[in-house]
Structure formats: structure tokens, C-alpha cells
Amino acid sequence: MIRTPKTILWLLLALSVLAPQTNAQQSRGPRAGSPRGVEVLPMDARAVQPRVPFLYRATEAESAPAVEQVSSVGMTVSDMDRSIEFYSKVLSFEKVSDIEVTGEDYERLQGVFGLRMRVVCMKLGDEAIELTEYLAPRGRPVPADSRSNDRWFQHIAIITGDMEKAYTRLRENKVEHASTGPQRLPEWNKNAAGIKAFYFRDPDKHWLEVLQFPDGKGDAKWHRPSDKLFLGIDHTAIVVGNTEASLKFYRDVLGLSIAGTSENYGTEQEHLNNVFGARLRITSLRAAGGGPGIEFLEYLAPRDGRPAPGDERASDLFHWQTILVVGNLDRVAQSLTTQSFRFVSPGAVAVRERQLGFARGLLIRDPDGHVMALVEK
């Protein structure tokens, strides 16, 4: 083969690079004082390491999950004093704040013209709920024929250390059953075996769940010794039509992480949900900064759950909104806009005097119509 001067030049250049590398390979080995198993290159070998092209690296703020924390879970109520009495007397919540708000900023935030709201925050353990009564305008009740597989279904899961005592407390206070009674999930279901659960309803027909984890399941804090019957809120659950579509919203855009999965069916699950033939794909998600989880309930069967009403408003009693704290509301709003998710608010809305504990917020619907309130403190 005939070598051109250019070819010879490239060969000489290659030899000049390979020679020091060969020497470096012969002299490699852990240096005295270096960590065990970590190989430190001699200086001559470092000098000839190939240069790596500059790659763009996202800043810490850009790469951080959009949602920092699940702050609380909100629901609309018809009679605030009645709801406060129910949640405090029956379930041991404590009132933290009680405020009335009105004005154009809140109208734009909530998507309801002419509103006046009474908003009460109540805590149970480390977690909180936010109850909102619309003094004006009044909204519609929960549909009387609602079922647990309809896609406007949402509940909070309240943890107890003693299901029998918890059920007795609920019966003494004549709560409305949504399950036939407490259910213990079967041993064959590895991810849910031994969990005890019961669905019931508050005075406005909101679904609630009381839940007891067996040893080895659930957050460690639910197993600490306590003299309290009700300990806190583990998660809020929502019915979804398609888990993968919901993951694109909650995981891929909002940055929540999958914490667990399960597929539940059988007579215990049917009587818990009070849906014959219920077979559920369950996916639990968590925010990096803590707070209650968000749990998807996808009914693989039956598939006759109804979609959420398209004209649902925040003043309706079947309205829930889960409050999510974000670090950069504008960045999240832009991402949601480009992916065509449905806004309740016209965009990020600044609210006066941080009356509800945040400076700006927006309401957005997930693929099934569940509302998330994104707030920037």
C-alpha cells in the first residue's frame, strides 16, 4: 500500500500518543494512601487522556423535580362548621387556621367568578386537609349514584393502629358506610397482604378510607408506639382511566416517583370498593420532599366507571384539589402548556398577602380531570 505524506503524518501522531499510554499502563496500580479499589493514574497518563467534548449540563434548579412536596389535600364542603365538628370529633383532626378570602385574584385562581370562600386547614399528625366552603356561589352536591370506580372518585387514607377500635368509633358516630365493613387483604397478594381497610363517607359524601398496615408494610412512622387512634394521612387515591397516561402527567412532568405497585382483586377488594368484579392496578407515587402520596386506582375491571363531569367547578362538592408545592411555577406552567393539559386558572396567579400561605398558584387538571393546585411559596 502506498502511503501519502498525510497518512504518514497521522501514523506518527498516533505513535506519539500510544507510547506514553503504554508506559502509563505498565506503571498503574493503587497509590499509597488511595482508597481501596480506586485506581489513580500517574501524571503522564493523565496528560494524554482523550479530551471529552463539552456537554451541556442542566443546572440543579432545571434538573430538580417540579413538585417539591405534597402539602395537603383539599375538598369543597357545604357547611364548614359541620365539617369541622366531624373531622375533629370523629377523626381527631385539629384546626390550624380559619380564613375568608374573596377578590379577583382568587376568582382567577379557582376559575369561579364572584366567589367568597371560607378556608379551614386541619391537621392530623404531620399531614393536613384543606376544607373550603363557597359562601358564594354555591355548588352542586356529589352525584347520588356515585360509585368507587367513577373517575371523579378521590379519597384520603387515614392511618390507624387498631382497625377494630377505629371501626367502633366510626359506628358510634353513625358514619355512612361505603364498604360493607373492614376488609383484610389476602395473603396471596404479596404487596398488600394483611392490610386492613374500610371506606366510609363524610357528611358531604366525600369518600374516606381508614387503613391499618401490618408489620413490614407502610411507612415506619405508622408503626411507632402511639396512644392516638388516628395517626395521619398516608395518601390520597384517585381513579384513573389509564395508568400510563397518568404517569406522563405526574411522573414525567411533575416529577413524582413511583413508590410501589400492586394488582388487587378478589372478594375482599370487591367488598372494600363495593364494586362487583373489581380488579385494580394500583400505583403509588411520592414527592421528593414528602407529604401524603398520590395513588392511582385503575379499574382493569369493570370498565364501566364514568368520566368526571366536564363542567365540574371548584365550588361543586365533588371537587377535590391536591396542593403541590413547586419551586418554579413559571417553568412548570410552560411545560404543562406545551403538552396541552387543561388549565383551570388562566396561568400563574399572584395572590394578595399570602393569605393561604403561598404567593402564586395555578390549578390544572390531570388526564382524568382531577385538579392539582400548584403553589409557589
Please describe what each predicted stretch is.
Residues 1-9:
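Bacterial N-terminal signal peptides that target proteins for export
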Residues 25-65, 68-78, 118-131, 136, 142-231, 238, ...:
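Vicinal oxygen chelate
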Residues 8-19:
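Bacterial N-terminal signal peptides
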Residues 20-24:
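Sec/Tat signal peptide C-region and signal peptidase I cleavage site
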Residues 81, 85-101, 136-137, 146-152, ...:
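Extended intrinsically disordered, low-complexity coil regions enriched in Ser, Thr, Gly, Ala
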Residues 76-127, 172, 188-192, 239-293, ...:
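Core segments of cupin and vicinal oxygen chelate
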Residues 139-140, 206, 304-306, 370:
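Short, charged/polar, Gly/Pro-enriched secondary-structure boundary elements
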